[in-house]
Amino acid sequence: MDRCKHVGRLRLAQDHSILNPQKWCCLECATTESVWACLKCSHVACGRYIEDHALKHFEETGHPLAMEVRDLYVFCYLCKDYVLNDNPEGDLKLLRSSLLAVRGQKQDTPVRRGRTLRSMASGEDVVLPQRAPQGQPQMLTALWYRRQRLLARTLRLWFEKSSRGQAKLEQRRQEEALERKKEEARRRRREVKRRLLEELASTPPRKSARLLLHTPRDAGPAASRPAALPTSRRVPAATLKLRRQPAMAPGVTGLRNLGNTCYMNSILQVLSHLQKFRECFLNLDPSKTEHLFPKATNGKTQLSGKPTNSSATELSLRNDRAEACEREGFCWNGRASISRSLELIQNKEPSSKHISLCRELHTLFRVMWSGKWALVSPFAMLHSVWSLIPAFRGYDQQDAQEFLCELLHKVQQELESEGTTRRILIPFSQRKLTKQVLKVVNTIFHGQLLSQVTCISCNYKSNTIEPFWDLSLEFPERYHCIEKGFVPLNQTECLLTEMLAKFTETEALEGRIYACDQCNSKRRKSNPKPLVLSEARKQLMIYRLPQVLRLHLKRFRWSGRNHREKIGVHVVFDQVLTMEPYCCRDMLSSLDKETFAYDLSAVVMHHGKGFGSGHYTAYCYNTEGGFWVHCNDSKLNVCSVEEVCKTQAYILFYTQRTVQGNARISETHLQAQVQSSNNDEGRPQTFS
C-alpha cells in the first residue's frame, strides 16, 4: 500500500524490544520464524503462517502496525496490506537502519532451536556444545536473507530505471513539493493571524472607535482625545503593508442583519445586482436636489420648499473620510476594522431631516459596488424604510415580496413628486437624469397582460389590456390538497413551466355572469328589459414583455381560518426561460424569437416552514465578475448555477436577453385582428 494513514500516528518507544535481537521470538510459542514486532508496544509474536499470535495481539489491543524483524516488512492490519510509505519523521527508515546495524553485529550467544539459553542462577549464558548440523540452518538462513536483499535491490534499481518507475518517482516528488508548499502556506497564514491578533489586541473596540469618530471637533483639545483609528505615524510600515489587501470584486459586499432584516437585505442585494436598475441609481446624484425630495412627517411624506445643503455636505464629508481611511491603508479585510470603517459611510440615522429612499439607494449601491468593503450596516436605509413605510417598522419578520412592491412604489412616488413639484429649481442635467431614472423604475418591471373574455353564446371575444409588475404563480391543485393519505409535498416536484401554463390557461367563469356586447348590441339603452347574461371563458396572455420578469411563487396557503402554511415542494426552473408559449398569438408573429428568451438573474429563497417566520437569502448573478453569489446577510459565498437551480425559490428574476422597441403590438392592430376573427366566424355558435 503506497499511502497508509496510520503510519503518520506512529510513535515508537526508544526501549522497544525490537532493538534487542535476544527478544526476537514469539512471546506465546517462543518460535523465531516469521516473528513480527508491534510498533505500538513491546510485544513480539509470530505471523499467520505459524500460530498467528500477532493477529490475536491486534484483535486484543487494536495496534495495527507490525514489522517483520528479519525481512523488515511493515504490515497494517487495518488496511490489510503491506506499508510502503513512512511518517514525516522517517521513523521506519531509521528503525530499518538500526536493525540492519544490529543484525550485522557478531553474536556469540549459543541458541537451541532459535532460543538463547541462559542460566537461572548466575544470569550468565550457559554454553552448550554445538553440533555440526546446528550451524547449517543459520548459514542457510543468512544466505537466503542476503539473496533476498540483493534481489530486492536489483528489482528496485530496475524499477527506478523503467518509465513507470520514473513516473512514480516524479509523482512522488511533485506530491512532496506540493506538501511543502501547503505547509509553507499554512505557516504564513499562522504568522499573519498571529500578527493580526496582536494588532487587534492593541486597537480600541468598535463601539468606542465609532463614538470617538462622531465626537465634535470643539469638544476638547486634539491632544487630549485619543485617536479613533491608528495613524500612519503610530503604525509601523510593516503593519501597513500587511493591511493592504487586493481589492475585492465589486458587488461582493454583505449586509449586516439589524434584527430580522433578512427580507430587506435579500431584496437590496437583488436590486443592486440588476445591472440597469443599479446603474441608473449610481448615476443619480441626490445631493444636488436633496431639498426637493420628500421628508417624513409621522409616516407621511410632504414636500419641503426650503433648500438645505446639510445632507450634501455630510455625504461629501463621509466620502472624504472613507477615502482618507483608504489612503492611510485602513481598508483591509479584517472583520473588526471593516465594521469601524463602514460607520463612516452608513450612519445609524440619516443626518438630514429630509428622508429619501433614492438617496439611500444611491449611497448604498456606491458602497456595495466600490470593491472596497466586505460588509456594511444599512442603518440609514432601515431608518428610511421605517419612516416612509410604517408597515415595516419594528423588528418583526416581514414578507420579501411585499417589501419589494412597497419599496418600488415609494421610490416611484418620490421620483414623480420630485420631478413635477419643483421642476424650475432643478438643474437641467439633473432633471434629465431624474427622468431617466423614473423611466427605468417605471419600465424595468412593467409588462402588460391581455385579458380575453370569450362569450360562449356567440363566441365574441372582448380584449382588455392590464398592466403588471410581477406574475404571481399558483401551484397546481394537487399541492393544495391536505387530505389524509396524500403524498407529502416535499417528495414531489413542480415545473415552473407548468405554473406558467396554469396562469395562462383558459378558465370558465362560474354561471351566467357575463354581459356580452355582441349579444346586447340590438337591445336599446332605453329598453327596460334586463341585460342578457351568458356564460363565458377567460384567458390571460402576455401582451407586452418586461425587461426584468419577476415570478412570485405563491408558496403560502391558508390552512384553517387563521393559519397559513408553506408549500415546501421544489420548483424546477432553468437558467434560460422561453416565454413564447405564454404570449398572445398576434405577438408571436411581430417579434424576433430572441426577444422571448430570458436569462436567470436572481433568486430569493425562503428558509423555514411557516408564514411570518424563517429566513430569507438571495442568489444573485454578478455581471461584473460573471459568477453567482449566495447572499446570506453578512455572509457571501460564490456558488455554481447548478447550486442555484436546486434551491427552493420564492421569487425568481429573469432578465430579457434582447430588448426590442417593438415589444408589443399596437392596440389598433389587435382590435383589427379580433374583429376579423369575429367576422370570420359568421353566425353565433352555441357551445355546450
UniProtKB/Swiss-Prot annotation:
PROSITE patterns: USP_1 (PS00972), USP_2 (PS00973), USP_3 (PS50235), ZF_UBP (PS50271). GO terms for molecular function: cysteine-type deubiquitinase activity; cysteine-type endopeptidase activity; histone binding; histone H2B deubiquitinase activity; zinc ion binding. Its main location: nucleus. Pfam families: UCH (PF00443), zf-UBP (PF02148). Keywords: Chromatin regulator, Cytoplasm, Hydrolase, Metal-binding, mRNA processing, mRNA splicing, Nucleus, Protease, Thiol protease, Ubl conjugation pathway, Zinc, Zinc-finger. Zn(2+) 1 binds at residues 4, 6, 76, 79. InterPro entries: Papain-like_cys_pep_sf, Peptidase_C19_UCH, Ub_carboxyl-term_hydrolase, USP_CS, USP_dom, Znf_RING/FYVE/PHD, Znf_UBP. Zn(2+) 2 binds at residues 26, 29, 46, 53. Residues 169-186 have a biased composition (Basic and acidic residues). It catalyses: Thiol-dependent hydrolysis of ester, thioester, amide, peptide and isopeptide bonds formed by the C-terminal Gly of ubiquitin (a 76-residue protein attached to proteins as an intracellular targeting signal). GO terms for cellular component: cytoplasm; nucleoplasm. Residues 169-230, 293-315 are annotated as: Disordered. Residues 253-657 form the USP domain. Its EC number is 3.4.19.12. GO terms for biological process: mRNA splicing, via spliceosome; negative regulation of phosphatidylinositol 3-kinase/protein kinase B signal transduction; protein deubiquitination; proteolysis. It is found in: Nucleus; Cytoplasm. The active site is at residues 262, 615. Zn(2+) 3 binds at residues 38, 41, 57, 63. Residues 298-315 have a biased composition (Polar residues). Deubiquitinase that plays a role in several cellular processes including transcriptional regulation, cell cycle progression or innate immunity. Specifically deubiquitinates histone H2B at 'Lys-120' (H2BK120Ub), a specific tag for epigenetic transcriptional activation and acts as a regulator of mRNA splicing. Antagonizes DNA double-strand break-induced ubiquitination of H2AX thereby participating in the maintenance of genome integrity. Component of a complex with RUVBL1 and PSMC5. Interacts with centrins CETN1, CETN2 and CETN3. Belongs to the peptidase C19 family. This is Ubiquitin carboxyl-terminal hydrolase 49.
